[in-house]
Amino acid sequence: MKEEECSPLLSQDTAGREHPLTRNSPPTANIPCPAPWENQKGSWGCRCCPGAKRQASGEGQASSLPLSTGSNCVKYLIFLSNFLFSLPSLLALAAGLWGLTVKRSQGIGWGGPVPTDPMLMLVLGGLVVSVVSLSGCLGAFCENSCLLHWYCGAVLFCLALEALAGVLMVTLWKPLQDSLKYTLHAAIIHYWDDPDLHFLLDQVQLGLQCCGAVSYQDWQQNLYFNCSSPGVQACSLPASCCINPQEDGAVVNTQCGFGALGLDQNVAGQVVFLQGCWPALQEWLRGNTGAIGDCAVAVVMIQGTELLLAACLLRALAVHEAAEDIEAGPL
């Protein structure tokens, strides 16, 4: 090295002695600036992910600061609860997709007389719940603040939608009743057109022990059960209208309602249910208002608890990251 030149990594004092540059020494043009986040491992490519600052760039050693016991409990509680919620939602999603696939293979269209396709509702509900639950599950397990922030936003959005639905249900109760009654009539008319509609209406009639929308005579609106129909089901009713469809046997007698529409009301009342499903549904709602309210409050409380736990975990992760930065010191 020539006498008039100095090393780019060394500085000289007035006596000509060389000594290493200190931390406060100005940078020189010969020293390249290290690339940001160089030599870091474990990052998912997101600045808010936990692995982004877990290793020192020079030493390559991970920080040894663990989460506190309370934060770990919150973390695994969020993971377990959302994992349990994701299982039935994924099952519902799979069942809905299977049902839609079967319907398409049978040539049944997406549109129908009822406002919404039951299988499509099952798919959408299962998809929303599974995506939200899995984001909370993975966000807590991986300590990923990006997913946890998204999870909190999704839960808040669901709570807002539920509050809006409650307000609309109270303010628009009368139009909702009329719409539900119309849906029952439409389901009767198109009973044989959609297997999902067929199944749901049968379950409603069996569960509420009713027949038709307002009375059992509403089945006259169906082309197959109308008394003027030339088919074998003329003046008949579905087996789900029968008081004892199995007739004390193991197999349902699908012909138990044959000819019931042509019978006298007193005679027909011994074979089938005469009350319509709409009055029966109103009576059921009045008798179970308290239970429905308790379920709604429980759902809101569960969502609020999950939101609070996620916020606590986010705060703990922020404090933990700040502590790691302090422990690592300036680079």
From Swiss-Prot:
Disulfide cysteine pairs (residue numbers): 210-277, 211-241, 227-235, 242-256
Location of the region described as Disordered in the Swiss-Prot/TrEMBL record: 1-34
Record keywords, A-Z: Cell membrane, Disulfide bond, Glycoprotein, Membrane, Transmembrane, Transmembrane helix
Residue stretches spanning the membrane: 77-97, 121-141, 153-173
Stretches of the chain found on the membrane's Cytoplasmic side: 1-76, 142-152
GO cellular component: plasma membrane
Topology in membrane: Multi-pass membrane protein
GO process terms (BP): protein maturation
Subunit organization: Interacts with ADAM10.
Sequence similarity: Belongs to the tetraspanin (TM4SF) family.
Protein name as it appears in the record: Tetraspanin-10
Origin species: Mus musculus
Species lineage: Eukaryota, Metazoa, Chordata, Craniata, Vertebrata
